[in-house]
Amino acid sequence: MRLFFLFFLISQSFYSQELNCKVNINYSSIPSPNKEMFNSMRQGIYEFLNNTNWTNDLFENEERIECTVLIRIDQQLSTDEFSGSISVQSSRPIFKTLYNSSILNIFDDQLRFKYVEFETLEFNENSHFSNLTSVLAYYAYLIIGMDYDTFSLSGGDPYFLKAQK
């Protein structure tokens, strides 16, 4: 048992997810909002983006791609259906400086999705589970593709193709 636990810890130290994404949900347009549900939504999206393995590459914690996702909820159409907008930004450090350079800055005002409180956000690149996870996966692959393009010509192409699925 100790050997298994040690192996698990060592394997986790060598493998890290690709994104270090901050997530914010703005629901100020919703009258009498269920704050716990929106906090659960924010946490679920945060875990989905930051804990999913989007590539087969190994990332150290300090190599993770910095990004921000802001979802503004304009309408709650039903208990589990929402419409609003999403803003996605990513940046990367400039070599041998203390500065970051903006890589991606997108605003989409046509976001519509369903979310059930405490429901796990699942992803399989060959299946469609929900509009929310598909949109988030699209932007995750776009962020990764843009970041890989900063290292080599067409380096992000495989991730742009995954985003198109």
Where are these regions (language model features)?
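Acidic/His-rich structured neighborhood in mature extracellular/periplasmic domains
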Residues: S83-K165
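Start-of-domain marker
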Residues: Q17-S83, I94-K96
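Sec-dependent N-terminal signal peptides
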Residues: L3-S13
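Alpha-helix initiation and N-capping motif
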Residues: R2-L3, A137
